[in-house]
């Protein structure tokens, strides 16, 4: 074959590669085979690259295996194909095999395999490749440096990524993009914006591209920096990026405004997108749902369904997930009914969200039915059910389903293990919890995280074994975090261990002085013990620092309308009726059950009458008060469902228990920790929460 003819065929192969024309590329391959002398090292490498990029890995391997001679380009093209097709471990395996055959990598080989390490979160392998780069002098090459920044960022080593970035001499736009994206991935939104400022000052040849600006908008949306986000929006307009044709950037703007609570601006940006993506639709629908605009959210979803039947599983599961979090059963069922008509509605991730929705709405039987009907179950499916059982106080069922999962040869991950340990904790199953914890590393090879230790601390503490719980924290091989100390402090209050509580409180105020929850917990510890001076000091210290605790919020759905209440709020139009209803309920509780329990659990040094008024203003009581006011105290056999963002307090718990006895109404309350099903004076938690 004459050189010009071979060169023309190579040019055709490059076009086929760029445009994904595997059939036409295959015809060129056949012609080269028939010509006898057409295939050589160069044309074979082009064929491997073409087949890989056209998603034909088997054909790429056929060419590779038939080559009498291979060079680094041959190996690198095949590795790139593995990464492109999602076989990341395959690429790393080829990298090792190439080394065994004595072929040295080039910058492209290093970049490809560092990318694989980042996507696999394979830090150890990434470190080995970095060491190899240093050994043969490739680290300073900009392509390799960029890939190192990306790898370290994805593996959670942002400081290492920054060190490599600083050593890159001739930084390209890709270098800056990798560092900005790394900071965003690590949650350092401000640093991402600062890096963009440095990039502007560096005056690089290339202007920011869509990737740069999308990362910056993510930095603002993930940290709630609306002012900075608006500045980026202004930069987009001035730079000519903000136009209806730029769907990626405009979609990121929608996401920014949604996450910062600016729905009007989000809708305005959304309406400007000509080719709306599924992500932009999902962002806006979720935004309306999260702000309580459920009618608007459902309307948008129906409009999306009319325009596009290919709604993906991520959008469906995300929207159902919002209704699950708000425990909106009616809307969740509507979404389920719409989802089953779509091809993606039967995917495992969507069905997982449906099961989760039923569990979070308190319908265990419905959740079990959906779970049983699922054809394919992944570890998330089992984790959802284990978590749900735990929240409902069904610890034995959680443990049983965990072992059933193992019998189906599905290995638990660290989240699944956290769910079953938490279930044991909520149900007081100390022996089972300790046994499961011992198998975490030993049997399943999962390195315990601080959250796993926190479950065991909670397990021991609920049984009154506070010294053992403290000893576990002191001796565990990882650094304790704020959450585990807060768990122990809460247990000290429950068991009245003031001395240990003081010790734990000092640790918390030292390591997390800006967290209002710590001052509230210390105040409650002292208040319950009647140490009013110490309680006042804790509250005053929190006030001096300008800290405010998260307000209690509850909601209840009545006649297709969701009513939200905040503790101490009196803005609801039926507030006078609600207060009278609650007073009447309290009167009946006193007369029929001798109810005075709440007075000793109201943690303020005020007179009894004021305590009673404070307790009556708790958000869950206001929600129940509305349900009783609209339906009357005589709704025998009915069920009232209330949902709260924080843990239910002791007084409200006792109040609802008594109420379920005198009214013969069942009450289901989901708080931040678990479900409480009240019936005939008893709670499903067994007063253990």
From Swiss-Prot:
GO MF annotations, alphabetized: RNA binding; zinc ion binding
Biological-process GO terms, alphabetical: RNA modification
Domain of life: Eukaryota
Entry keyword annotation includes Repeat: yes
Stretches for region Type E motif: 484-559
Family affiliation: Belongs to the PPR family. PCMP-H subfamily.
Protein name: Putative pentatricopeptide repeat-containing protein At3g15130
Species of origin: Arabidopsis thaliana
Organism lineage: Eukaryota, Viridiplantae, Streptophyta, Embryophyta, Tracheophyta
Gene name linked to the record: PCMP-H86
């Amino acid at each position: 074959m004459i050189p010009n003819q071979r060169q023309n065929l190579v040019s055709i192969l490059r076009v086929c590669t760029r445009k994904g024309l595997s059939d036409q590329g295959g015809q060129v391959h056949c012609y080269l085979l028939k010509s006898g002398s057409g295939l050589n090292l160069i044309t074979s490498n082009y064929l491997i690259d073409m087949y890989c990029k056209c998603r034909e890995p088997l054909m790429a391997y056929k060419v590779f295996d038939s080559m009498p001679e291979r060079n680094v380009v041959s190996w690198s093209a095949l590795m790139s194909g593995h990464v492109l097709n999602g076989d990341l471990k395959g690429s790393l395996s080829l990298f090792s095999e190439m080394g065994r055959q004595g072929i040295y990598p080039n910058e492209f080989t290093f970049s490809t395999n560092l990318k694989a390490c980042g996507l696999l979160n394979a830090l150890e392998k990434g470190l080995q490749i970095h060491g190899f780069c240093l050994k043969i002098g490739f680290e300073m090459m900009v392509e390799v440096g960029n890939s190192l920044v990306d790898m370290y960022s994805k593996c959670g080593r942002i400081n290492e990524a920054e060190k490599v970035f600083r050593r890159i001499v001739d930084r390209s736009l890709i270098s800056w993009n990798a560092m900005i994206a790394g900071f965003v991935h690590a949650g350092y939104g401000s640093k991402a914006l600062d890096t963009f400022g440095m990039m502007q000052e560096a005056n690089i040849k290339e202007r920011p591209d869509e990737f740069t600006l999308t990362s910056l908008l993510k930095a603002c949306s993930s940290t709630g920096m609306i002012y900075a986000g608006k500045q980026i929006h202004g930069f987009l307009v001035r730079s000519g990026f903000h136009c209806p044709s730029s769907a990626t950037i405009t979609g990121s703007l929608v996401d920014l405004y949604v996450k910062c609570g600016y729905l009007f601006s989000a809708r305005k940006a959304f309406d400007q997108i000509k080719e709306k993506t599924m992500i932009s639709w999902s962002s806006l629908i979720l935004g309306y749902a999260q702000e309580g605009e459920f009618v608007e959210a459902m309307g948008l979803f129906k409009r999306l369904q009319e325009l596009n039947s290919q709604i993906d599983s991520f959008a469906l599961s995300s929207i159902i997930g919002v209704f699950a979090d708000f425990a909106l059963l009616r809307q969740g069922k509507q979404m389920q009914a719409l989802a089953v008509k779509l091809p993606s509605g039967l995917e495992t991730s969507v069905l997982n969200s449906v099961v989760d929705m039923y569990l979070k709405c308190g319908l265990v039987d419905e959740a079990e039915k959906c779970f049983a009907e699922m054809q394919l179950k992944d570890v998330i499916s089992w984790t959802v059910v284990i978590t749900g059982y735990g929240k409902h106080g069904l610890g034995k069922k959680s443990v049983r389903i965990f072992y059933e999962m193992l019998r189906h040869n599905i290995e638990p991950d660290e989240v699944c293990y956290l769910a079953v340990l938490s279930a044991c904790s909520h149900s007081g199953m100390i022996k089972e919890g300790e046994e499961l914890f011992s198998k975490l590393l030993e049997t399943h090879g999962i390195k315990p995280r601080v959250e796993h230790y926190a479950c065991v601390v909670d397990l021991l503490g609920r049984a009154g074994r506070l010294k053992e719980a403290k000893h576990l924290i002191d001796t565990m091989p990882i650094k304790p975090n704020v959450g585990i100390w807060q768990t122990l402090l809460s247990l000290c209050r429950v068991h009245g261990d003031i001395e240990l509580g003081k010790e734990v409180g000092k640790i918390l105020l030292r390591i997390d002085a800006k967290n209002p929850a710590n001052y509230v917990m210390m105040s409650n510890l002292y208040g319950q013990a009647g140490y009013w001076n110490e309680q006042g000091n804790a509250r005053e210290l929190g006030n001096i620092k300008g800290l405010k605790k998260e307000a209690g919020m509850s909601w209840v759905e009545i006649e297709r309308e969701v009513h939200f209440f905040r503790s101490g709020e009196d803005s609801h139009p039926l507030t006078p009726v609600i207060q009278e209803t609650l007073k009447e309920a309290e009167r009946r509780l006193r007369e029929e059950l001798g109810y005075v329990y709440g007075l000793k659990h109201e943690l303020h040094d005020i007179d009894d009458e004021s305590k009673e008024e404070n307790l009556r203003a708790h958000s869950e009581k206001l929600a129940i008060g509305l349900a009783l006011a609209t339906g009357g105290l005589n709704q025998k056999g009915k069920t009232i469902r209330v949902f709260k963002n924080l843990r239910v307090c002791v007084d409200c718990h006792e109040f609802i228990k008594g109420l379920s006895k005198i009214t013969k109404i069942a009450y289901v309350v989901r708080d931040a920790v678990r479900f409480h099903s009240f019936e005939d004076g008893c709670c499903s938690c067994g007063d253990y929460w």
